[in-house]
Structures are given as structure tokens and as C-alpha cells.
UniProtKB/Swiss-Prot annotation:
The gene is SFG1. GO terms for cellular component: cytoplasm; nucleus. Probable transcription factor required for superficial pseudohyphal development in response to nitrogen starvation. Residues 289-308 are annotated as: Disordered. It is found in: Nucleus. The keyword Magnesium does not apply. One of its GO terms (biological process) is cell-cell adhesion. It comes from Saccharomyces cerevisiae (strain ATCC 204508 / S288c). Its main location: nucleus. Signal peptide: none annotated. Transmembrane segments: none annotated. This is Superficial pseudohyphal growth protein 1. Residues 291-305 have a biased composition (Acidic residues). Keywords: Nucleus, Transcription, Transcription regulation. Coiled coil: none annotated.
């Protein structure tokens, strides 16, 4: 039994080959890119792409010093000129820095620095440099400085000082130095000219009498005129308006008049005529009754029938034979132009 027990214990043991495992647990790689001394990347496989971060240098508000300019208003009389006479030329000879007493002085170190530059405007020999380095050793401040208001302010100040140096008061009469002013071109009105001739709103034709008519009249056609049997112009206008409106439809046709000896009489319903007159009086008023005297005379003649009379009249034109007219029209094709007057009366 002892042997059996010993054999069981041997069978339950873990073999030595299973005790040691050659597997290595991988560690989470760094997301940053690592380079060796020879600028060769190490054999690493990161889980995400590494990002290259570039430091953003911001302008420190502590290292900016506003610069001002002053203009000397003392000028010699020989230097008085108009700067607007020459284009693209600006005279800044009298603009001096406040740190200089006269023109022969040299600019100091802090005056050569622009307010937009990242370089400190404090002199390198000044003891204030150590204070700034202790506060911000890298020259980077968390405050983002906006330079646009300062630039606008400096530009307006410079513009004001330049224009303030110009002589605002006129020169004395005893002064021999002339003040040059820009020459302005005088625009003369065409009305004041001696050669000006006012014209009317009339077109200037190439030909005084155009040979071709605008309206084309058919051959052997008549001009139909409507009149009233009682001689009233108002009634004739009403009759012609009604006839033109009814002739627009194909169903309403009137007998054609082929000669000047023919006459067409159409009886008229007087109630319709009175309806038109009342409607016209409501729209235009009593002033439209320009034939009131004739209407009073017509009222006395009740025995005359109320009717519309249509007569035909020939067109009177100075045209010649058709062949001669065709030749004239062909020769005047180049003259079909109208030129309006160049100068119109105002």
C-alpha cells in the first residue's frame, strides 16, 4: 500500500517541463515615438499612432513695451511744401523718437524693437532682465496678447501727429514762400460755352422724309369711319367702340364695304347707349360731356332714328406705280437708322 501511495504521488506531480513557461507578458507600449542615439526607431509596435507635439511659443505680455513717436513742428520756411504734390512720397524727416534730443543722436537698443516683435524691449544691460527671467524663464506667458488694438492706436496717433505739423493758417502776405497746392481741373458746363446750342427732344433722322411708310396698307382697301345718324360725336364714339369689340369674334361679322358709294347702317338700342353714357359720367364726371350742346339739339329731333352709319373712304397717298415704289424701297435699305440728339435740353 505504501508503494501504491508513493506511485500515486508521483503521478500527480507536475512535470518539470511544464513548470517553466517561456512566454513573456507584453507591456503596454508608450504612445510617444522613441529614437535611439543613432536616430533609429526602436522595434516597438504601438497600439495607436504616435503624435508629434510642437511647442507653440506665445508672445509674452510682460516683454512688450509700447513705443510712441513725436513730431517736431518747428520748420523752416524753405521746407514748406505740399506733401500731396508727389505721389508715393512721404516726408518723415521731422519725426523723431522721444528719447532723442536732436537728429544726430543714435537710437538706443530698446527703441529699435518693434512692438510686434517677440524680442524683449528691455535693454540687456538693465537689471530688470533678471526679474523677468525668474518669472518666465522660457519667455512664454499663458496670456495671449492681441496686438491689433495697439497697432491701430499707434497708426492713428502717427497720422494725427503728421497732419498736425502742417501749417493750418494761411501764410502772411509779406511771405515770399509760395504754398504749392494741387491743381484741379475745371469742368466747364456746356451751357456756359459760346458754341452751346440747346436742342429739343427730337430725333435726328438721316432722311427728313422717309420713303418707306411704317404702316402697310393693303391694295384697294378703304378707311372705315363710324358716325351717328343724329350727328353726335359721343354717340359715334360709343358705336365705334362697340363695333370693334364685337368684330374681334369670328361669329360676329359685318357686311364688307367695297366702294366709297356704299353705306352701312346699323340700328342701335337707345337703352344701351344711355348705359354707356351713365358709366362714362361716373368715371370721368360731368366734364366729359363735351358734346352736351349737340345732345340738347338731338333731344328735340326725336323723329330721327338712332343708328350707327359706317362709310368707306379712300387713302390719299403720294405713292407712284408699284414697280417704282419697289425700286425706291430697295435703294433705301441702308438709310433705316435713327440717331438721337447728342445733347438734350435740360
Amino acid at each position: 500500500m505504501d508503494e501504491m501511495h508513493s506511485s500515486d504521488t508521483l503521478l500527480l506531480r507536475t512535470p518539470k517541463s511544464k513548470k517553466k513557461i517561456g512566454l513573456v507578458i507584453p507591456s503596454t507600449p508608450s504612445k510617444k515615438c522613441k529614437y535611439s542615439s543613432g536616430f533609429i526607431a526602436e522595434d516597438t509596435t504601438p497600439s495607436k499612432r504616435f503624435r508629434l507635439y510642437q511647442a507653440k511659443f506665445k508672445t509674452s505680455s510682460k516683454n512688450v513695451k509700447a513705443q510712441t513717436l513725436s513730431v517736431s513742428i518747428k520748420k523752416n520756411q524753405g521746407e514748406i511744401t505740399n506733401p500731396f504734390m508727389t505721389e508715393g512720397y512721404n516726408d518723415y524727416r521731422n519725426i523723431v523718437s522721444p528719447g532723442l534730443s536732436f537728429d544726430n543722436d543714435c537710437f538706443s537698443e530698446h527703441e529699435l524693437v518693434s512692438p510686434l516683435s517677440d524680442i524683449s524691449s528691455i535693454n540687456s544691460t538693465s537689471p530688470d532682465v533678471e526679474k523677468i527671467d525668474s518669472l518666465d524663464p522660457f519667455g512664454v506667458d499663458s496670456f495671449v496678447w492681441n496686438c491689433k488694438p495697439l497697432v491701430n492706436k499707434e497708426a492713428l496717433e502717427l497720422h494725427r501727429m503728421i497732419h498736425s505739423s502742417f501749417p493750418m493758417s494761411p501764410l502772411e502776405s509779406n511771405s515770399d514762400v509760395p504754398l504749392l497746392l494741387p491743381k484741379l481741373k475745371k469742368r466747364l458746363s456746356p451751357v456756359n460755352r459760346s458754341t452751346f446750342k440747346p436742342t429739343r427732344y427730337e430725333p435726328s433722322h438721316r432722311l427728313l422724309k422717309p420713303k418707306k411708310s411704317i404702316l402697310t396698307v393693303p391694295a384697294k382697301s378703304l378707311n372705315l369711319i363710324v358716325s351717328s345718324s343724329r350727328g353726335s360725336l359721343n354717340d359715334a364714339t360709343i358705336f365705334a367702340t362697340e363695333i370693334n369689340s364685337t368684330l374681334s369674334n369670328e361669329e360676329n361679322k359685318l357686311p364688307a364695304i367695297s366702294s366709297i358709294w356704299e353705306k352701312l347702317t346699323i340700328p342701335v338700342n337707345s337703352s344701351i347707349k344711355e348705359k354707356y353714357k351713365k358709366l362714362k359720367d361716373q368715371i370721368y364726371g360731368q366734364a366729359s360731356n363735351f358734346g352736351e350742346d349737340e345732345d340738347n339739339e338731338e333731344d328735340n329731333e326725336d323723329d330721327l332714328p338712332d343708328a350707327a352709319v359706317i362709310r368707306g373712304y379712300e387713302f390719299q397717298s403720294g405713292r407712284r406705280d408699284e414697280l417704282t415704289q419697289c425700286n425706291e424701297l430697295q435703294s433705301t435699305k441702308d438709310y433705316k437708322k435713327v440717331q438721337w440728339a447728342k445733347v438734350l435740353e435740360q
